[in-house]
Curated annotation (Swiss-Prot):
N6,N6,N6-trimethyllysine modifications at: 130
Residue positions, PTM Phosphothreonine: 64, 69, 419, 1241, 1255, 1265, 1286, 1467, 1501, 1517, 1730, 1736
Organism, scientific name: Canis lupus familiaris
Region (Disordered): 1125-1147, 1153-1172
Residue(s) carrying Phosphotyrosine: 389, 424, 1464, 1492
Official protein name in the record: Myosin-1
Domain called Myosin motor: residue spans: 86-782
Record GO biological process: muscle contraction
Subunit-structure text: Muscle myosin is a hexameric protein that consists of 2 heavy chain subunits (MHC), 2 alkali light chain subunits (MLC) and 2 regulatory light chain subunits (MLC-2). Interacts with SLC26A5.
Residues the entry annotates as binding ATP: 179-186
Main localization of the protein described in the UniProt heading: cytoplasm
Length: 1939
């Protein structure tokens, strides 16, 4: 016991952990009468304290503490322990150990709130139902590193012991916290996790990851936070517990090599999902529902569309809605915080809450029945709308899927009607499935977060699983939970009791086996063994017409009255009906089987599951992502068949699989047990119900554990350790200087000590002590050490006293001497001579003293100086030391940094290598593109030079034309009289303008549509341009950094190679040493184990020999009598065998017919029913025959037993039999050696199989990786194809200048959209085909697993057969007869052998464990061997059946193999044809692509010409505006407007002609496109058909993959050659793909240039349209002005006539003549002004000609790609030159005419002065003639311009044609790329199929070889059996002859 000072470290928890010293002293001093103080049995309280009053006649009268007097029997009175044992911490230490002592010890400790108590090797805890301060941080610190006996009992002590064991023993640990529901298991689990998270912190923070803006917690925080989240979604209130875990969890906490936390993971078991939709009255659903509705977070209420009243929701309000001990609001905050700490994203958090809310809404969905129909229909859609909204589904689709689900019938899907109840059941199933899958997904996410990827070595597992449950209504969930607790209790018993006693047996300790009455095998076998409850349940689930009633009848038929643990319950009033009862270790439970079949199959509405998979909520879609495929394969089961092939896996099978995994994990660890106890049913703190606690103590094995500790030997020490430690007790017993064995020394030592010699035993390696004896030895050792130390101290004290005494004697003598001298001095000090001496003496020594002082001063100075120097030197050295230490630290930091930088550099080096490879590929691509661009540039340069030469010639011609035009313009003044004609023509122009206005509106609408499309494309182009610029910058940066990194990389590589070499050498040496060490350790352990086994077997067989000597003679005497009975039995057996074979044959025929007819019509189903009835009848007949044979065998066995009893004393030939037995013993030893070697062979084979399994798993992962890469490649190609198609559509839309073109291209776009949909459908089909391939691969793996399991079972069966046959001897024939008869009864089990192979493997393992535990005596050995013979005979038959099945399967494989080979050759031929066609298409694509590029250039030229035309229109508009400003020169302006109008009309006519031509061309191109498209579609369809055929072939190939065994090796060489050829083709296609990528990039650049040009063109088009509007307004204004001028002209004409008359009247008058001269002078001045204006116009026209020259230069650029038209253009140029020469001649004539006109004008002026009227009229006539000539010349010029424009249009047509050709090239290139991608994908699939077939081939051959070996061993075993029979007969005949 610790003192109060030692307990002070526990702080305020100390009073709750251990009694104080004062209480312990008071307890020891309390009066106590051991004779009268007792516990007495009492009906109400079970046991009470009392005092014995009297004892008479076996009766005891006891007075209780309450004052009552009881008279009971002696066995109902139990003595009390002394007061010092009150509240003892380890109940195994009590003097009197019985039920009342344990009960009251727990009760008294519980009353003092000490809730933890040790009970032998485990800990008992009682639920306090209140908070106690025993889990604080200071308590954790106090328990850290403490041994169990050094600290009070506590869960922290158990945890620390497990932690220390893990570190010291290097073994995984587990803590099993078990008990009934409500006992406190979950709380203790949390405390264990809290302890580990505190003591094993990593010391540094986990990397903080930012997820959705939130920072995650450390690993310790996350481990602790996992509990609140799991409790919110997995805990609920039950009748016995407010916070009951409705799921089991096994938490593994992983630790690193230093003992620090590394990671954690959680495995969950058996979530009670039925609680989501149903609760009892006193219970409630999971906490999360009520937390959300607590209104702590109103935003959740709003988001989930719910209220705060739980009664509004049917699923969560069937029981209670509040729990007093739980604050739902605070718990919601804790849950939300845990979600943050565990790193869930915001989307995941919202999804969790939304799915939870959707489950609540599901419960409120209402449905009703249609009138006059059974069909259900929704009763309102509001709730469904909310649920669908929360799950991102369509409400109408959800309701339709619920009411009208689609089910698969054969190969088709049909719509099925649902009744109202069926719909409600489906809704409930969906709600439970969503909640369960969400819970499992959360656990997976938590595990991902807790997996830190740190190195981990060992783990400590904490098991917290639902406790034993007994409710009013117990269903399948309760059976699973109780069965789990039953298995755990069995594990506890096995570990605590059986292993303990096996240890004694192994050590040779004599030990009486204790029967604890806790053998749970009967109940467990009733549930899980073949024909058990689970087996019958799964069998019923396979029959479509099975019901709960048929299930109950089968249970009754199989178990009622045959198993003591299975009973029929008694009906109870007021309770739900129960169908059967099971007697568990904790009590009898009544089970209701209602709905068990549906629960076990767990069906879901597949239509709704399909909606879930397509949900926009990613979390929901992920939860059900694999449901459809799994269910389709599983045949409607909950999970896809993992190990059962095509059969579905039920809930019970999945549960048993998980339970077996859990038990396997537990068996691989060192367990620590914690037992939780419920003190009372009312949850009252401090109260304890005696009967309840006693029941738990009995059922939990607590009392039995204490008893075995007391009766056993819990303390054990190795002999060497015992000798070393306790030699001090009697050193004389072990002689010094003489070697003596440690065991003998320990025996002598214990024999010489005064202890009870019955309290210890000597084993082979250890000495064993009963409880308490080791403590006594420790006390004796302490006493002995105290004596020795006392003696040592006495001698030391004596020695010190003698030393001190000697010193005292010496001091006394010194004092005597001093006293004598002082007395003498006192006598002589007054003498005169003495006084003189005193005066002179100092003077004599003063000189010497002065010298000495001077010397001393000098020495002092020197010493001082040296001291200063030393001090300075010391300081200097200290400074140096500090500097060196700092430098050392810096160097250490530098070394660490360099190590880190080296690691980083290595990572960067790897990344740079990858980057370098990528950049080299990019550089290579860029280099190739640059070379192509250089070639193109050189070609363009040559063309440019040639065109420049041609341009210079054209410039000369244009200069001549300019001179001619300048001269022509000078003649404009002669055209003034054409104003009238212009006025008439303007009316026609108005009509034309009106038409153009209408056309303009139509163009504006089309233009607006084009602008919208153009804007979208510009945005895309801008984005791509930015991305391109950014990528180019990145490439430049990477190229710059690459050079720097190369240098660093070279240095790092040299260092890395050196380090890698050193590391490799060190690792190899380390691995060699470790391997040698492990091998030696394993050999040593194995030898020790074999030695101990052989020793025990020798002893057993010695006893066996003695008994066999007695029994053999009895058996041999009885053999003769039994042989006669055997002959009769053989006759009956032959008859039964014949019947069995007939029935088996009929049964096989019926089974084959049933399998062939499975999925047939109703008539076939009826026939199956009849056959099943016949089968049942045959089975009953068979069972009756079996019962008869069993009765006969029982009679024989009874007779045999009687004869054995009668002949028991007839023993005479004992010695001869003994010699024979010794000989047989030696033979058995040899057989044991053979069996050991066989076991080693089996273990090696098992290891090889495990390696093979791992290799297959690696191959599967590689296949998955390849499949993902193929999928990514397909996605990239699809995206590229879609992008190119989009660009093609955009190019088409850019040419939409008219409404009609827009409609046509829209139809083209629709066609492209349909084509894209078709391609998507094709892609989906390919994906489905790949998924089918994956499923086929998975099924192949399943078949492989089944074969491997069959092989392992066969191996085990053979080994067990050999062991059994070596010991069965003469009884084999009799037992074989019995078990062959039993085999008839198990025909049905043989039919289900494939399904139950995995279960039999587990049974075999448990059987091996049972065999090892039951070798105590000969009778048990004989019984065990008989059981093994029985099982092995069944296994032999099953093995033969399996062999036959394998032979049949082999023949099928051979057939399928031949089919595959033929299909493979066909596929290869088709693949070569496809490759040839692909190459030809690629060549065509390249040609078309070149033509397409030329077309793009022509399109660019066309756009520039359009721009120039718009510029010309703009210039003309400006000229018209200038003409409007000169009203006073109306005639000249009219002439100019007429000319401009003519030009505009010509331009408009030309535009109309061009437009009509363009429309015709577009229609023609559209037709060509349609033709090309139809051709491509046809080719695509052909390729699709080929691809579909290939896919079908490949699907058949994959389905028959198991058949590609022997033929694949022969075709491997051909496949390798084909692979090389395909790789060459692949390289060619990759080159073509790179070229196509370059062409695509160039097309993208051209597209961007075209977009820029189109944008400029659009701007100019807008300006032209605005100018056209202005022109229209100006024309109207000019028309009005022309009318005014016409009126003025008429007035002038009238005035002229009047003047003429006046001139005739006053001709002689001078004044009139003078006025006339003045008028002529004015006219002359006007003509001079007109001349100047014409000169100005000529200068303007010259400027326009300069613009024309610029346009000609632009035309040079346009002619880059039109070299083919050069000849035509040259001819046209020649014609133009002729025209120009003609115009030159005309120009000269005109100049001459102008001179003549000038001369005539002068003469006219002179004549005008003279008044020559006739001359003026002649001049006017001449002017008209000249104007006519000028007009004809203008017309000729206009025709010339039209001809030139026609040629330009021809050039544009050629450009456009080239562009269209280039587009076609791109389309064909896309098609070729897609076909190449498909060819590559199928090539990879073929390679993968080949690899898989090779793997399967090797596996099959290996299995076949192993099967042959097994058959050989079986033959050997049969031969041994025959030998044994012969030997038995010989022995029998010898005995008879001797008698």
């Amino acid at each position: 016991m610790s003192s109060d000072q030692e307990m002070a470290i526990f702080g305020e928890a100390a009073p709750y952990l251990r009694k104080s010293e004062k209480e312990r002293i008071e307890a020891q001093n309390r009066p106590f009468d051991a004779k009268t103080s007792v516990f007495v049995a009492e009906p109400k309280e079970s046991f009470v304290k009392g005092t014995v009053q009297s004892r008479e006649g076996g009766k005891v009268t006891v007075k209780t503490e309450a004052g009552a007097t009881l008279t009971v029997k002696e066995d109902q009175v139990f003595p009390m322990n002394p007061p010092k044992y009150d509240k003892i911490e380890d109940m195994a230490m009590m003097t009197h150990l019985h039920e009342p002592a344990v009960l009251y010890n727990l009760k008294e400790r519980y009353a003092a709130w000490m809730i933890y108590t040790y009970s032998g090797l485990f800990c008992v805890t009682v639920n306090p139902y209140k908070w106690l301060p025993v889990y604080n941080a200071e308590v954790v610190t106090a328990y850290r590193g403490k041994k169990r006996q050094e600290a009070p009992p506590h869960i922290f002590s158990i945890s620390d012991n497990a932690y220390q064991f893990m570190l010291t023993d290097r073994e995984n640990q587990s803590i099993l916290i078990t008990g009934e529901s409500g006992a406190g298991k979950t709380v203790n689990t949390k405390r264990v996790i809290q302890y580990f998270a505190t003591i094993a912190v990593t010391g540094d923070k986990k990397k903080e990851e930012v997820t959705s803006g939130k920072i995650q917690g450390t690993l310790e925080d996350q481990i602790i936070s996992a509990n609140p989240l799991l409790e919110a979604f997995g805990n609920a209130k039950t009748v016995r517990n407010d916070n009951s875990s409705r799921f089991g969890k096994f938490i593994r906490i992983h630790f690193g090599t230093t003992g620090k936390l590394a990671s954690a993971d959680i495995e969950t078991y058996l979530l009670e999902k039925s609680r989501v939709t149903f609760q009892l009255k006193a219970e409630r659903s999971y906490h999360i529902f009520y937390q959300i509705m607590s209104n702590k977070k109103p935003d959740l209420i709003e988001m989930l569309l719910i209220t705060t009243n739980p009664y509004d929701y049917a699923f969560v309000s069937q029981g209670e809605i509040t729990v007093p001990s739980i604050d739902d609001q605070e718990e919601l905050i804790a849950t939300d915080s845990a979600i943050d700490i565990l790193g869930f994203t915001s989307d995941e958090r919202v999804s969790i809450y939304k799915l939870t809310g959707a489950v609540m809404h599901y419960g409120n969905m209402k449905f009703k029945q249609k009138q006059r129909e059974e069909q259900a229909e929704p009763d309102g859609t509001e709730v469904a709308d909310k649920a669908a909204y929360l799950q991102s589904l369509n409400s109408a689709d959800l309701l339709k899927a619920l009411c009208y689900p689609r089910v698969k019938v054969g190969n088709e899907f049909v719509t099925k009607g649902q009744t109202v109840q069926q719909v409600y059941n489906a809704v409930g199933a969906l709600a439970k499935a969503v909640y369960e899958k969400m819970f499992l997904w959360m656990v997976t996410r938590i595990n991902q977060q807790l997996d830190t990827k740190q190195p981990r070595q060992y783990f400590i597992g904490v098991l917290d699983i639902a406790g034993f449950e007994i409710f009013d209504f117990n269903s399948l969930e309760q059976l699973c939970i109780n069965f789990t607790n039953e298995k755990l209790q069995q594990f506890f018993n096995h570990h605590m009791f059986v292993l303990e006693q096996e240890e004694y047996k192994k050590e040779g300790i004599e030990w009486e086996f204790i029967d604890f009455g806790m053998d749970l095998a009967a109940c467990i076998e009733l549930i899980e063994k073949p024909m058990g409850i689970f087996s019958i349940l799964e069998e019923e689930c396979m029959f479509p017409k099975a019901t709960d009633t048929s299930f109950k009848n089968k249970l009754y038929e199989q178990h009622l009255g045959k198993s003591n643990n299975f009973q029929k319950p008694k009906p109870a009033k007021g309770k739900v009906e129960a169908h059967f009862s099971l007697i568990h270790y904790a009590g009898t439970v009544d089970y209701n089987i209602g709905g068990w079949l549906d629960k076990n199959k767990d069906p879901l509405n597949e239509t709704v599951v399909g909606l879930y998979q397509k949900s926009a909520m990613k979390t929901l879609a992920n939860l059900f992502s694999g449901a459809t495929a799994a269910e389709a394969e599983a045949g409607g089961g909950k999970k896809g068949g993992k190990k059962k092939g095509s059969s579905f896996q039920t809930v019970s099978a999945l549960f048993r699989e998980n339970l077996n995994k859990l038990m396997t994990n537990l068996r691989s660890t060192h367990p620590h047990f914690v037992r939780c106890i419920i003190p009372n049913e009312t949850k009252t703190p401090g109260a304890m119900e005696h009967e309840l606690v006693l029941h738990q103590l009995r059922c939990n094995g607590v009392l039995e554990g204490i008893r075995i500790c007391r009766k056993g030997f819990p303390s054990r020490i190795l002999y060497a350790d015992f000798k070393q430690r306790y030699k001090v007790l009697n050193a004389s017993a072990i002689p010094e200087g003489q070697f003596i064995d440690s065991k003998k020394a320990s025996e002598k030592l214990l024999g010489s000590i005064d202890v009870d010699h019955t309290q210890y035993k000597f084993g082979h390696t250890k000495v064993f002590f009963k409880a308490g004896l080791l403590g006594l030895l420790e006390e004796m050792r302490d006493d002995k050490l105290a004596q020795l130390i006392t003696r040592t101290q006495a001698r030391c004290r004596g020695f010190l006293a003698r030393v001190e005494y000697q010193k005292m004697v010496e001091r006394r003598e010194s004092i005597f001497c001093i006293q004598y001298n002082i007395r003498a001095f006192m006598n002589v000090k007054h003498w005169p001579w003495m006084k003189l001496y005193f005066k002179i003496k100092p003077l004599l020594k003063s000189a010497e003293t002065e010298k000495e002082m001077a010397n001393m001063k000098e020495e002092f100075e020197k010493t001082k100086e040296s001291l200063a120097k030393a001090e300075a030197k010391r300081k200097e050295l200290e400074e140096k030391m500090v500097a060196l230490m700092q430098e050392k630290n810096d160097l250490q930091l530098q070394v660490q940094a360099e190590a880190d930088s080296l690691a980083d550099a290595e990572e960067r080096c790897d990344q740079l290598i990858k980057t370098k490879i990528q950049l080299e590929a990019k550089i290579k691509e860029v280099t190739e593109r640059a070379e192509d661009e250089e070639e193109i540039n050189a070609e363009l340069t040559a063309k440019k030079r040639k065109l420049e030469d041609e341009c210079s010639e054209l410039k000369k011609d244009i200069d001549d034309l300019e001179l001619t035009l300048a001269k022509v313009e000078k003649e404009k003044h002669a055209t003034e009289n054409k104003v009238k004609n212009l006025t008439e023509e303007m009316a026609g122009l108005d009509e034309t303008i009106a038409k153009l206005t209408k056309e303009k509106k139509a163009l504006q609408e089309a233009h607006q549509q084009t602008l919208d499309d153009l804007q979208a494309e510009e945005d895309k182009v801008n984005t791509l341009t930015k991305a391109k610029i950014k990528l180019e910058q990145q490439v430049d940066d990477l190229e710059g950094s690459l050079e720097q990194e190369k240098k660093i990389r070279m240095d790092l590589e040299r260092a890395k190679r050196k380090l890698e070499g050193d590391l490799k050498l060190a690792q190899e040496s380390t691995m060699d040493i470790e391997n040698d060490k492990q091998q030696l350790d394993e050999k040593l352990k194995k030898k020790e184990f074999e030695m101990s086994n052989l020793q025990s077997k020798i002893e057993d067989e010695q006893a066996l020999a003695m008994q066999l000597q007695k029994k053999i003679k009895e058996l041999q005497a009885r053999i003769e009598e039994l042989e006669e009975e055997i002959e009769a039995e053989r006759a009956s057996r032959a008859k039964a065998e014949k019947q069995r074979s007939d029935l088996s044959r009929e049964l096989e025929e019926i089974s084959e017919r049933l399998e062939e007819a499975g999925g047939a019509t109703s008539a076939q189903i009826e026939m199956n029913k009849k056959r099943e009835a016949e089968f049942q009848k045959m089975r009953r007949d068979l069972e009756e025959a079996t019962l008869q044979h069993e009765a006969t065998a029982a009679t024989l066995r009874k007779k045999h037993a009687d004869s054995v009893a009668e002949l028991g004393e007839q023993i005479d030939n004992l010695q001869r039999v003994k010699q024979k037995l010794e000989k047989e013993k030696s033979e058995m030893k040899m057989e044991i050696d053979d069996l050991a070697s066989n076991m080693e062979t089996v273990s090696k084979a098992k290891g090889n199989l495990e390696k093979m399994c791992r290799t297959l798993e690696d191959q599967v992962s590689e296949l998955k990786t390849k499949e993902e890469e193929q999928q990514r490649l397909i996605n990239d190609l699809t995206a590229q194809r879609a992008r190119l198609q989009t660009e093609s559509g955009e190019y088409s839309r850019q040419l939409d200048e008219k409404d009609s073109l827009v409609s046509q291209l829209s139809r083209g776009k629709l066609a492209f959209t349909q084509q894209i949909e078709e391609l998507k459908r094709q892609l989906e089909e390919e994906i489905k085909a790949k998924s089918a391939l994956a499923h086929a691969l998975q099924s192949a793996r399943h078949d492989c697993d089944l074969l491997r399991e069959q092989y392992e079972e066969e191996q085990e069966g053979k080994a067990e057969l050999q062991r059994a046959m070596s010991k069965a001897n003469s009884e084999v024939a009799q037992w074989r007869t019995k078990y062959e008869t039993d085999a008839i009864q198990r025909t049905e089990e043989l039919e289900e052998a494939k399904k139950k192979l995995a279960q039999r493997l587990q049974d075999a393992e448990e059987h091996v464990e049972a065999v090892n535990a039951k070798c105590a005596s000969l009778e048990k050995t004989k019984q065990r061997l008989q059981n093994e013979v029985e099982d092995l005979m069944i296994d032999v038959e099953r093995t033969n059946a399996a062999c036959a099945a394998l032979d049949k399967k082999q023949r099928n494989f051979d057939k399928i193999l031949a089919e595959w080979k033929q299909k493979y050759e066909e596929t290869h031929a088709e693949l070569e044809a496809s490759q040839k066609e692909s190459r030809s298409l690629s060549t065509e694509l390249f040609k078309i692509k070149n033509a397409y590029e030329e077309s793009l250039d022509q399109l660019e030229t066309l756009k520039r010409e359009n721009k120039n035309l718009q510029q010309e229109i703009s210039d003309l508009t400006e000229q018209i505006a200038e003409g409007g400003k000169r009203i006073h020169e109306l005639e000249k302006i009219k002439k100019q407007v007429e000319q401009e109008k003519t030009e505009l009309q010509a331009a408009l006519e030309e535009a109309e002609a061009s437009l009509e031509h363009e429309e015709g061309k577009i229609l023609r191109i559209q037709l060509e496109l349609n033709q090309v498209k139809s051709e491509i579609d046809r080719k695509i369809a052909e390729k699709d058909e080929e691809i579909d055929q290939l896919k079908r072939n490949h699907i058949r190939v994959v389905e028959s993959m198991q058949s590609t065994l022997d033929a694949e090796i022969r075709s491997r060489n051909d496949a390798i050659r084909l692979k090389k050829k395909m790789e060459g083709d692949l390289n060619e296609m990759e080159i073509q793909l790179n070229h196509a990528n370059r062409m695509a990039a160039e097309a993208l650049r051209n597209y961007r240039n075209t977009q820029g040009i189109l944008k400029d063109t659009q701007i100019h088009l807008d300006d032209a349209l605005r100018g056209q509007e202005d022109l229209k307004e100006q024309l109207a204004m000019v028309e009005r002005r022309a009318n005014l001028l016409q009126a003025e002209i008429e007035e002038l004409r009238a005035t002229l006539e009047q003047t003429e008359r006046s001139r005739k009247i006053a001709e002689q008058e001078l004044l009139d003549a003078s006025e006339r001269v003045q008028l002529l002078h004015t006219q002359n001045t006007s003509l001079i002004n007109t001349k100047k204006k014409l000169e100005t116009d000529i200068s303007q026209i010259q400027g326009e000609m300069e613009d024309i020259i610029q346009e000609a230069r632009n035309a040079e650029e346009k002619a880059k790609k039109a070299i083919t038209d050069a000849a035509m253009m040259a001819e046209e140029l020649k014609k133009e030159q002729d025209t120009s020469a003609h115009l030159e001649r005309m120009k000269k004539n005109m100049e001459q005419t102008v001179k003549d006109l000038q001369h005539r004008l002068d003469e006219a002026e002179q004549l005008a002065l003279k008044g020559g009227k006739k001359q003026i009229q002649k001049l006017e006539a001449r002017v008209r003639e000249l104007e006519g000539e000028v007009e004809s010349e203008q017309k000729h010029n206009i025709e010339t311009v039209k001809s030139l424009r026609k040629h330009e249009r021809r050039v544009k047509e050629l450009t456009y044609q080239t562009e269209e050709d280039r587009k076609n090239v791109l389309r064909l290139q896309d098609l070729v790329d897609k076909l190449q991608a498909k060819v590559k994908a199928y090539k990879r699939q073929a390679e993968e199929a080949e690899e898989q077939s090779n793997v399967n081939l090797s596996k099959f051959r290996k299995l076949q070889h192993e099967l042959e070996e097994a058959e050989e061993r079986a033959d050997i075993a049969e031969s041994q059996v025959n030998k044994l029979r012969v030997k038995s007969r010989e022995v029998h005949t010898k005995i008879i002859s001797e008698e």
